[in-house]
Amino acid sequence: MSIQDNFRLAMRRYIYSVSIMSNRDLNDNLNAITVSSVTSISMNPPSILICINKSAKIHDSIVIGSKFCINLLNKDQQQLSDLCSDEDRHDQRFLDKNWNTNDIPFLSNAQANIFCKVDKLASYYTHTVVIGLVEDANFSETISTLTYVDGKYI
């Protein structure tokens, strides 16, 4: 097997929380994508890192100064995760009644919402590393986070 195959199989052993990154682009279009590569960077200033594939529809809407939300999903939101990872169903992503789309789109029933402003972008081969400054955050008191390992939700 190639190093890429071995690396992919090794990474499948990690358990990831599942989130949806959502934003509104400069033309007022709503975007959302399922992401598992979300990491806190610092508490001072509060900041977060997300990796987005350059081929994703949302990619070009992520620019310095733009705003986005990381919606940490709960165990009941597996179907929404699947929907937001399917480029062919992009037009269906905001049909869920729990989306608040007044400003930065966010899921009102998510485990947590982390509202950010893009501070830095770093291109790295197939992906862009997005560094966001956290402007606000809220969370549910009950912890029931949707997780993913070895190609399956748990």
Predicted region positions:
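Basic, polyanion-binding surface patches
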Residues: 1-154
